[in-house]
A protein has these predicted regions:
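Surface-exposed amphipathic alpha-helical segments
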Residues: 40-41, 85-88, 131-160
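Bacterial N-terminal signal peptides
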Residues: 8-19
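Conserved polar/disulfide-associated segments of primarily extracytoplasmic proteins
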Residues: 45-127, 135-142
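N-terminal "mature-domain start" segment
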Residues: 24-49, 99, 148-160
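Short N-terminal leader segment in a subset of presequences, especially plant chloroplast
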Residues: 9-11, 32-37, 63, 68
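Positively charged n-region of N-terminal signal peptides that target proteins for export
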Residues: 1-7
């Protein structure tokens, strides 16, 4: 569990340093499909490690990054949110308490000039963490609301 959360946190922080972008019209995994509208790019291929899958997307004009991670953790959405936000706080982030949003949970965070929001969902076997960071959280929310097509609706939030 700690390795999966560390992997997720490392990828989230690593994306802040990522400057290259590869164009992609669609991101497709076993868990979701995400169509990328104009301005959005997939900064690197979907990554898989230790059973976790992560897609990293960015919009340079909006200065916004979105990550979608699915991990094999048998936790509730609330427990996933609580543990992740606690780990982020220990790493120096300012974090909010997890807030229920339907069957999912969300939490806001910031560190120095970086602000973001994460959405946590679970289906009993897998957990997902969707994070939006950057200058325009609304741009990331719109991308997800309009373009995310989950394979399992329980694994993703119903609203952003």
């Amino acid at each position: 569990m700690q390795k999966v959360l560390t992997f997720t946190a490392t990828c989230l922080l690593g994306i802040l340093l990522c400057a290259s972008a590869a164009l992609a019209a669609e991101v497709k995994t076993d868990y979701f499909t995400l169509n990328l509208p104009s301005g959005w790019t997939q900064s690197q291929p979907v990554q898989s490690a230790q059973g976790a899958t992560m897609a990293i997307l960015q919009n340079a004009a909006e200065q916004t990054v979105v990550t979608v991670a699915v991990t094999p953790v048998p936790l509730s959405a609330k427990d996933l949110a609580t543990q992740t936000l606690t780990n982020m706080k220990a790493a120096g982030f300012t974090v909010s308490e997890p807030v229920a949003s339907g069957d999912s949970y969300m939490g806001e965070f910031s560190k120095e000039q970086v602000k973001g929001i994460s959405y946590f969902s679970a289906n009993g076997k897998l957990g997902s963490v969707i994070t939006i960071m950057g200058a325009s959280l609304d741009a990331g929310k719109k991308l997800l609301k309009d373009n995310l097509k989950p394979v399992d609706g329980k694994l993703f939030p119903t609203d952003f």
